[in-house]
Regions:
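Conserved helicase RecA-like core
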Residues: 1-169
Length: 169
């Protein structure tokens, strides 16, 4: 949670966090709320009114963080998303593009970060090859990382990546 707190604590605008599963979305959102962040979630099991409430609250600034599955990546229009965090690495480059495309819109500044484990390195490299780019990497201590998986399941470390030209905080 230290790493996420560090990333979120420096953001001025809204942050959109993508997870792969509904359960992961719920777990991350609950942990963020417990840590004192104003957070909401969107995933496929939420009713349309729950999704609308979360999205409207995010757009209006009542929530600093929106945690979502890929359901929100396509067609989501929020003007002031300062940071997109891929909490779970997407398996397809196309999904990666749709996720990170939620930040830095209409000429504004934005940052995209991806969190992955060593096991996912091949998937990240496949995305980089497809997109013909190399992302900057930064190591994190697994004991202070995000609550995505327990420490024993993260192998040795976590890594953050950023799109070229973006700076980690």
């Amino acid at each position: 949670m230290e790493s996420l707190r560090e990333l979120l604590g420096t953001e001025v605008g809204q942050t959109l966090i993508f997870t792969r599963t509904k359960r992961g979305t719920e777990r991350v959102a609950r942990e963020l709320i417990r840590e004192g962040f104003s957070a909401a979630m969107i995933h496929g099991d939420r009713s349309q009114s729950q999704r609308n409430h979360a999205l409207n609250g995010f757009q209006e600034g009542r929530y600093q963080v929106l945690v979502a599955t890929d359901i929100a990546a396509r067609g989501l229009h929020v003007d002031d998303v300062a940071h997109v965090i891929n909490y779970d690495l997407p398996t397809l480059a196309e999904d990666f593009i749709h996720r990170v495309g939620r930040t830095g819109r209409a000429g504004s500044q934005g940052c995209a970060s991806t969190i992955f484990t060593p096991v996912e390195m091949m998937d990240l490299r496949a995305i980089e090859r497809t997109l013909q780019l190399r992302m900057e990497r930064r190591q994190f201590d697994p004991a202070s990382s995000l609550p995505r998986r327990t420490v024993q399941n993260t192998l040795a470390s976590r890594t953050l990546t950023a799109l070229p030209g973006e700076v980690f905080v």
